[in-house]
From Swiss-Prot:
Pfam families: Ribosomal_S21. GO terms for biological process: translation. The keyword Ribosomal protein applies. InterPro entries: Ribosomal_bS21, Ribosomal_bS21_CS, Ribosomal_bS21_sf. Belongs to the bacterial ribosomal protein bS21 family. It comes from the Bacteria. GO terms for cellular component: ribonucleoprotein complex; ribosome. Keywords: Ribonucleoprotein, Ribosomal protein. This is Small ribosomal subunit protein bS21.
Length: 61
């Protein structure tokens, strides 16, 4: 869990920026998007296979 303590002379904007940075580094939003809907094992395999194909195509170009 990400926590940010605000210092005495620190503004809310800078604390919010630090919080957003910590959330993005921890990958919380990406994880939330991935778990938004249930995904069966078959769907996971298909998604990963498509990603592999896409990466191969990018590396060839």
């Amino acid at each position: 869990m990400t926590q940010v303590t605000i210092g005495e002379n620190e503004g809310i904007e800078s604390a919010l920026r630090r919080f957003k940075r910590q959330v993005s580094k921890a990958g919380i939003l990406r994880d939330l998007r991935n778990h938004r809907h249930f995904e069966t094992n078959l769907e996971k395999r298909k998604r990963k296979a498509v990603a592999v194909r896409r990466n191969r195509r990018k590396s060839m170009a």
